[in-house]
Amino acid sequence: MPIYKPSELRLFLNQLGIFPKKGLSQNFLIDGNIIRKIVRASDVQPGNLVLEIGPGPGSLTQAMLEVEAHVVAVEKDFVLARELKRFQTPSKQLEIFCEDILMFSVEEELQSRLRDDQKAKVIANLPYHLTTPILAEMVVRRKLFSSLTVMVQEEVARRMTALPGQSDYSSFTIFLNFYSKPRYGFTVSRNCFYPAPKVDSAIVVLELKEPPPNIDAQVFFKITRTAFEQRRKMLRASLKSLFDPSKISNALEIIGQNPQARPEVLSLEDFIKLYHELYSSERH
């Protein structure tokens, strides 16, 4: 039976000698309606290969198995990973790895389980302190994954899906848009977890896409990160450590932007145009 009540989950964890660890962001989802909404949002179909990051007690794992997905669950906590075996069947629909996801051989383990041009999906209740490194690791794997459906802090979800001109818009937003199409799914109240965290969470779905061509990503992201380190400054000031300010102003004019523009008003497409213009002038 799914563990949807705080009292049931507390008893389950106590029997295992587990006391939720703040350092591991162990806040477990206990709302069955939310679990089903996550499965629907991720559009998991029978036969899909799903990488589940941090399954915990396994309520979401069980919901995905019920729609006949093939789940590869990666759980760092040894006891919780061991207890997930209660969902295993002879069909090997569930495979469990007790590992840190950032040390897990994602390509090696998943590629061998995919058929032809099939792609896997990622579903994760991301540890709050590891949200950025895990997303950075997964979102670049377009050839392996079709989508990521992640639970993150609500304020992080706003940053992930912000539009130019909004206060939450950042270099992180641009990075995600470079590799995917992020979409805000829905808010998840802190009361849907045990123990309840201090803030609400949200579901974000990222549909992975081909990154823009003819761009050195490392150089491009150096520009966007540098620009947003001083987001209230004009680009010609915030990027002066990389380019001559007059060159930045000229490039902004050429791409149809105000020479006094700040980074928060430029879209991904605008930054791409700026990148090409700046490096085009470098070559001449």
UniProtKB/Swiss-Prot annotation:
Reaction catalysed by this enzyme: adenosine(1518)/adenosine(1519) in 16S rRNA + 4 S-adenosyl-L-methionine = N(6)-dimethyladenosine(1518)/N(6)-dimethyladenosine(1519) in 16S rRNA + 4 S-adenosyl-L-homocysteine + 4 H(+)
Pfam families in the cross-refs: RrnaAD
GO molecular function: 16S rRNA (adenine(1518)-N(6)/adenine(1519)-N(6))-dimethyltransferase activity; RNA binding
Disulphide connectivity of cysteines: none
Record-linked PROSITE patterns: RRNA_A_DIMETH, SAM_RNA_A_N6_MT
Compartmental location: Cytoplasm
Major enzyme class: transferase
Keywords: Cytoplasm, Methyltransferase, RNA-binding, rRNA processing, S-adenosyl-L-methionine, Transferase
Any one Gene Ontology cellular component term annotated for this protein: cytosol
SMART domains for this protein: rADc (SM00650)
Residues the record lists as binding S-adenosyl-L-methionine: N27, L29, G54, E75, D100, N125
Cited SUPFAM superfamilies: S-adenosyl-L-methionine-dependent methyltransferases
Lineage top rank: taxon: Bacteria
EC code(s) of this entry: 2.1.1.182
Function: Specifically dimethylates two adjacent adenosines (A1518 and A1519) in the loop of a conserved hairpin near the 3'-end of 16S rRNA in the 30S particle. May play a critical role in biogenesis of 30S subunits.
Similarity comment text for this entry: Belongs to the class I-like SAM-binding methyltransferase superfamily. rRNA adenine N(6)-methyltransferase family. RsmA subfamily.
Protein name, as recorded: Ribosomal RNA small subunit methyltransferase A
Gene (UniProt): rsmA
